[in-house]
Amino acid sequence: MKITKVAVAGTLESSDVQVRVQPFDSLDIEINSSVAKQFGEQIEATVREVLAKLGITAAQVIVEDKGALDCVLQARVKTAAMRATDETINWEAVL
């Protein structure tokens, strides 16, 4: 999947996460979280895993975490990535 435009998913509310995805020449992940020292590596691993499953190898991903659960982070990354592409989504593969 190729990222062709800027897209955002999520909110900045407590227990949520806002994920911004935009075109970039390589994979760049920025994590802003009050719990980054404890969970930063896990957050990055989750983001990388979701992007890999979607076949994304080049994008800038900015994660503004407000204490979201892992399942919420996965959903937000998927949603932002799908909004940021012009490709037809294979929903059977995604779900």
UniProtKB/Swiss-Prot annotation:
<dbReference type="Pfam" id="PF06857">
    <property type="entry name" value="ACP"/>
</dbReference>
<feature type="modified residue" description="O-(phosphoribosyl dephospho-coenzyme A)serine">
    <location>
        <position position="14"/>
    </location>
</feature>
<dbReference type="InterPro" id="IPR006495">
    <property type="entry name" value="CitD"/>
</dbReference>
<dbReference type="InterPro" id="IPR023439">
    <property type="entry name" value="Mal_deCO2ase/Cit_lyase_ACP"/>
</dbReference>
<comment type="subunit">
    <text>Oligomer with a subunit composition of (alpha,beta,gamma)6.</text>
</comment>
<comment type="similarity">
    <text>Belongs to the CitD family.</text>
</comment>
<protein>
    <recommendedName>
        <fullName>Citrate lyase acyl carrier protein</fullName>
    </recommendedName>
</protein>
<keyword id="KW-0597">Phosphoprotein</keyword>
<dbReference type="GO" id="GO:0005737">
    <property type="term" value="C:cytoplasm"/>
</dbReference>
<keyword id="KW-0963">Cytoplasm</keyword>
<comment type="function">
    <text>Covalent carrier of the coenzyme of citrate lyase.</text>
</comment>
